[in-house]
Amino acid sequence: MTSTLITVVAAAIVEHGRLLVVSKKAAPGVFYLPGGKPEPGEDAQATLLRELDEELGVRPHGLTRLADFRGIAALEQAPMLMTVFAATLAGRPRPAAELARLAWTTGADGYRPLLAPAVRDQVIPHLRASGRLAWPG
């Protein structure tokens, strides 16, 4: 495991009680929030606009900063700081660029899809506590 902090910006997109998650071609069995790393000089919102366009071909609206989460990046196995924004989408998302698939989850779907630890252990509980993602059932 490397000790270099990875900074990531991600979107929590909830529709019809389900959270949008994506998998990467490099690790198609693990699902993350859509988003990515900022380019030099790019702020968090600009990063998210660029990443969602590149990865899903959509533009987010109503960006609201939810929280910063710290953990270990599932793919890189390095310390991570993930800034998460709530957003809605204009258009239908489709996986592109480095993405393999997308899925919608309640977070209580068992191991389908397999969620990255930060999503499973931090983001989903935060979304439930804030009322953005309801408990299933």
Protein language model regions, located:
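Conserved N-terminal beta-strand and adjoining loop/helix that marks the start
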Residues: 1-19, 37
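Actinobacteria-biased recognition of intrinsically disordered, low-complexity terminal regions
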Residues: 1-2, 135-137
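Structural detector for helix-capping/boundary residues
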Residues: 17, 36, 50-51, 105-108
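A conserved beta-turn-beta hairpin within the catalytic core of GNAT-like acetyltransferases
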Residues: 26-31
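The catalytic Nudix box helix
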Residues: 33-66
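Active-site-adjacent beta-strand/loop module that shapes the phosphate/pyrophosphate-binding cleft
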Residues: 59, 69-94, 103, 107
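NUDIX/MutT-family hydrolases
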Residues: 84-86, 94-131
